[in-house]
């Protein structure tokens, strides 16, 4: 009888433990399939789908969670654009997609792949830079900015390479030191990404060393001449203001946002994500390209850097207006310094676009004064 009593206590304890695990305290070694089934059972805002990538491999796609927090020295720095008063308040649309407003800017549509390096902070920066150069130049300049250059050469000012980094510092690096061109692994440009996409038995990637030469097949420019510079880098909002973030995107293009990642996010397939269950895994940085409403839920439209097999062909939606996973608390952007001499850039498809002296000058004047 005593054995039966202790067995009952043991089973009750196990049941309580499993329930606590599923509720989000910590799913520990429980199968990820259990988590996916739980997510799909308790809510209908988004759909989770079990994937075959192990937790061990997936953890390398995020960074140290501290990099998702704003730098303390920037906590009271308002957006330079709002301080200058360049944005005139106006009604914003209920839905917006930067791909539709600037259809000639191919990089806005591009989904890149960071592989097993926590370089999301550098990806987000490179993507925003690429998009904004195109937007400011009215589509005549379309560089695919190198993640590798930012990742390997920004150093400890930005963070710890594949372990994570600060998005704002990546943009400041672009403004002070410039960034060359370069697509994903095996791509075009001066300095493409070192790491190939991987989906099974993937080793952890280590931060590549900083190089100051272009790949041998790139004959267009030397490293220093291939540099693209920013005119400014700034925080978009210090108050988690949804309207300020929307206004920035609507007028100037995509922005970079850092946020906290939980286990359930790895299994996102579609819908409007919000944290449901699972432990905190780390931080992540992504590119916000728009917003909208789905089934009555406000969302941000976001480009991830985990390849096109993730989510909605590489994109995802996350709840807007509630600072979900702190995504509205650390949003940054920058303004490009367009060249005023004849420049030719290689995009990731190898197509070149050019800008004449007169055309570039007119574009700069139009962008800032019209």
UniProtKB/Swiss-Prot annotation:
SUPFAM superfamilies: Cysteine proteinases. The active site is at 120, 284, 304. InterPro entries: Papain-like_cys_pep_sf (IPR038765), Pept_asp_AS (IPR025661), Pept_cys_AS (IPR000169), Pept_his_AS (IPR025660), Peptidase_C1A (IPR013128), Peptidase_C1A_C (IPR000668). It comes from the Eukaryota. Keywords: Disulfide bond, Glycoprotein, Hydrolase, Protease, Signal, Thiol protease, Zymogen. PROSITE patterns: THIOL_PROTEASE_ASN, THIOL_PROTEASE_CYS, THIOL_PROTEASE_HIS. One of its GO terms (cellular component) is extracellular space. GO terms for biological process: innate immune response; proteolysis involved in protein catabolic process. Disulfide bonds join 105-134, 117-162, 153-210, 154-158, 190-214, 198-202. Glycans are attached at residue 138. Its EC number is 3.4.22.-. Residues 1-16 form the signal peptide. It holds the Pfam family Peptidase_C1. GO terms for molecular function: cysteine-type endopeptidase activity. Residues 17-91 form a propeptide. Belongs to the peptidase C1 family. This is Cathepsin B-like cysteine proteinase 3. It comes from Caenorhabditis elegans. The gene is cpr-3.
């Amino acid at each position: 009888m005593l054995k039966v009593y202790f067995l009952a206590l043991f089973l009750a304890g196990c049941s309580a433990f499993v329930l606590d695990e599923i509720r989000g305290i910590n799913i520990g070694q429980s199968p990820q399939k259990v988590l996916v089934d739980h997510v799909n059972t308790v809510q209908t805002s988004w759909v989770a789908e079990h994937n075959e990538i192990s937790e061990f491999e997936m953890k390398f796609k995020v960074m140290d969670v501290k990099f998702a927090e704003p730098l303390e020295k920037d906590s009271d720095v308002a957006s330079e654009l709002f301080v200058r008063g360049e944005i005139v308040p106006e009604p914003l649309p209920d839905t917006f997609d930067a791909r539709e407003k600037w259809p000639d800017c191919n990089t806005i549509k591009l989904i890149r792949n960071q592989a097993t390096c926590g370089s999301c902070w550098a990806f987000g920066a490179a993507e925003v830079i690429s998009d904004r150069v195109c937007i400011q130049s009215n589509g005549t300049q379309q560089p695919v900015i190198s993640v590798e250059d930012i990742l390997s050469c920004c150093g400890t000012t930005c963070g710890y390479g594949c372990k994570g980094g600060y998005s704002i510092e990546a943009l400041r690096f672009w403004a002070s030191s410039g960034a060359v061109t370069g697509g994903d692994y095996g791509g075009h440009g001066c300095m493409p990404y070192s790491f190939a996409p991987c989906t099974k038995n993937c080793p952890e990637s280590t931060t590549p060393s900083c190089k100051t030469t272009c790949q041998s097949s790139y004959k267009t420019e030397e490293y220093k001449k291939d540099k693209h510079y920013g005119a400014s880098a700034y925080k978009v909002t210090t108050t988690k203001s949804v309207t300020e973030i929307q206004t920035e995107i609507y007028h100037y293009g995509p922005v970079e946002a850092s946020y906290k990642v939980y286990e359930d996010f790895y299994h996102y397939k579609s819908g409007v994500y919000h944290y449901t269950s699972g432990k905190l895994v780390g931080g992540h940085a992504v590119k916000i390209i728009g917003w909208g409403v789905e089934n009555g839920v406000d969302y941000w439209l976001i480009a991830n850097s985990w390849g096109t097999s993730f989510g909605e062909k590489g994109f995802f939606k996350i709840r807007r207006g509630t600072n979900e996973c702190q995504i509205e608390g650390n949003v940054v952007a920058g303004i490009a310094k367009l060249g005023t001499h004849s420049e030719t850039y290689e995009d990731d498809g190898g197509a070149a676009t050019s800008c004449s002296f007169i055309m570039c000058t007119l574009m700069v004047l139009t962008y800032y004064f019209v």
